[in-house]
Regions:
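Phosphate- and divalent-cation-binding pockets in alpha/beta enzyme and binding domains
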Residues: 8, 115-119, 139
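PAPS-dependent sulfotransferase catalytic domain
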Residues: 86-96, 112-115, 141-224
Length: 226
């Protein structure tokens, strides 16, 4: 079963016709936090190379799809076997892949990148953003249960990428000026900092989905995405 609201919504989006979906791409977790520190043309070249050349074309050709049926992000969870088989039984060159992909769109799921989305939208104004909303108490309780920001969690690789200071791994979404503050914080204060950091962002025209609505009334909630 899906582990979180974002995973559920990701599966719904992946199931839509003409959508090529990337689940938490590691390359973008490294690249997106650098959006302010790399020249715009260089950053966009790297971003578009990954999304289009590496992911999109290879997804259409059946080379970068997740065929592990045990994974929540498996293509077999959301697409018909016949449509998947059609990708896997023949070799497709780039010219043909581009023709097939002419009426398709790219979607990707990436939690925790909201502080960087305004700049991303500045670069790509037609980009559409779906934002999962969850209350602070529920979010903090969930984080405490996972222990990601505990003394042990802060030395693990659960939040990646990170920088290391005083043997503590500081998540990529922590402001540079707050590094020392993060190291001194208690676990619950880190959870509160996280909630504020990823929610206190103005994202114009974002589609907002309530986690509580998704759980209580999934059909009507996901119908907003159709």
């Amino acid at each position: 079963s899906a582990r979180s609201g974002t995973t559920i919504i990701g599966k719904v989006i992946h199931s839509l016709k003409g959508v090529e979906y990337s689940f938490e791409p590691p390359a973008l977790f490294s690249l997106i936090p650098l959006i302010e520190s790399i020249k715009e043309n260089n950053w966009k070249m790297l971003y578009e190379t990954y999304l289009y050349e590496d992911f999109f074309i290879n997804s259409i050709c059946g080379r970068s799809i997740n065929c592990n049926i045990a994974d929540d992000s498996s293509i077999y969870k959301v697409k018909s076997k016949s449509s998947i088989d059609a990708r896997l039984i023949k070799s497709v060159d780039k010219v043909k892949a581009e023709k097939i992909g002419a009426d398709r769109v790219i979607a990707y799921k990436m939690p925790d990148i909201t502080p960087f989305i305004p700049k991303l939208i500045e670069y790509y104004p037609d980009m559409r953003v779906i934002f999962m909303e969850r209350g602070p108490i529920e979010t903090i309780n969930s984080l405490l249960a996972k222990g990601w920001f505990s003394k042990n969690g802060s030395t693990s690789n659960m939040t990646w990428p990170f920088v290391i200071e005083n043997e503590i791994k500081i998540p990529f979404w922590v402001c540079d000026k707050d590094s020392d503050l993060w190291c001194a914080m208690s676990e619950i204060d880190r959870c509160a900092y996280y909630y504020i950091r990823v929610n206190n962002v103005n994202i114009p025209n974002a589609i907002k989905i309530s986690y509580e609505d998704l759980i209580l009334d999934p059909l009507n909630t996901v119908s907003e995405l159709a």
